Amino acid sequence: MSSESLTVIVGLGKTGLSCAQFLAAKNRPFAVMDSREEPPEWENFIKTYPRVELIRGQFSEKLLNEAQEIILSPGVSLQEPLIAKQAAQGKSIIGDIELFARNVNKPIIAITGSNGKTTVTTVVGLMMKAAGRNVSVCGNIGEPVLEQITPEPDYYVLELSSFQLETTFSLRSQAATILNISEDHMNRYATLQDYLRAKQRIYTDCFIPIVNADEPEIWRHLPFNKKPLSFGLNNAADFSLAEHNQKTSIAYQGKILMPIQELKLNARHHLQNALAALALGTAAKIPIENMLHVLRDFSGIRHRCQWVRKYKEIDYYNDSKGTNVGATRAAIESLGQAAKGQLILIAGGQGKGADFSPLKDVVKRYVKQVILIGEDAPLLEKTLKEITVIKHADSMNEAVKRSTQAAKAGDIVLLSPACASFDMFTNYEHRGDVFTETVEAL
């Protein structure tokens, strides 16, 4: 195998396998390594590519040295010592999004942010479909991007994580946005500024930047080539809220589009998502009627502030996708404002090095009891114990029982962990499913 053209894929999950399939189809020589003994796709890989070198259980410096280019899966940090060493030597280190960007010519809408990106990506995809466009919604949501290159759609709508953006250099989007920023993945970034810098890469070579007017610190120092299109709940913006006939309505540059009561989801974070989707859709020239029709019909995504059921006049919400402090804060604030009573919060898991103190004010205002689960329960307790009643549970079943005992008519039980799930569950979907099944069995 000629090292002059050898590509080494680091990480063999769904993304790594999609990179292998892409390179194999192009007849490009490659090898794969994963520090795990049994990475998720290794059995599929050896069946399909029995003659391709696969190193499991460690990273091979020798193989990395032989590579002309390294494709890094988003789960592997650029700070990984052997990877950092290759970067310092000037080796090309890319991700699957970069490989994708080099090989597509169709317009791209690109979306990132700490919270709401899956919802906004989904909604923009639905708006495209409503306008009769053939669209592929992919990236950090659903299928890996490299599986969507053929057959080619009219449009791509990509959800992108900070990890994916770090290894992307050639993305040229028709429109791109950072929805918001709050602490997340601080186990991978030294500072919040480093995390923001990774996110800001989405605006490189973007034709129409879409910006959050309520968080100008994200974008105000960036050198845009074109005037941004803005959305915001509080500050002046192209897409905003306005009072009209004693109703709060969505407006575009002062023109009333629709009252928010026509939306099935109209809590604050849902409204921010709707405004962002309208701005992105406008940049993609989707007719306004199609966009408003989609917003009226949209009833949310599983595990994202999803209403589960009412039991003894208590409402249960599954926000298992609340894997960081900002997401949980937004969920507490939105549901707290809407609740007749108070909130009982189920939280905890793997905190990823986050600072939990931004939860204090909303917990104090809306939450009468917190049931803690998972390995970082002690850190959450340390932050919140002066503010509200803290209880512990060893399982989701016990957490749901304890929260039901603490709740009374008009209260809301909210699962929004502010943490990753891997200490107790396969992923956040599994955690949300266990919560939902437990609630439905009450």
UniProtKB/Swiss-Prot annotation:
Cystine bridges: none
The protein's Enzyme Commission number: 6.3.2.9
Source organism of the structure: Coxiella burnetii (strain Dugway 5J108-111)
Predominant localisation class: cytoplasm
Regions crossing the membrane: none
Subcellular location field: Cytoplasm
Family matches, as NCBIfam families: murD
Function: Cell wall formation. Catalyzes the addition of glutamate to the nucleotide precursor UDP-N-acetylmuramoyl-L-alanine (UMA).
Top-level taxon of origin: Bacteria
Protein residues bound to ATP: 113-119
Biological or metabolic pathway of the protein: Cell wall biogenesis; peptidoglycan biosynthesis
Cellular component aspect of the GO annotation: cytoplasm
Taxon lineage: Bacteria, Pseudomonadati, Pseudomonadota, Gammaproteobacteria, Legionellales
InterPro entries: Mur-like_cat_sf, Mur_ligase_C, Mur_ligase_C_dom_sf, Mur_ligase_cen, MurD
The protein, known as: UDP-N-acetylmuramoylalanine--D-glutamate ligase
Family classification: Belongs to the MurCDEF family.
GO terms under biological process: cell division; cell wall organization; peptidoglycan biosynthetic process; regulation of cell shape
Enzyme class: ligase
One Pfam family cited in the UniProt record for this chain: MurD-like_N
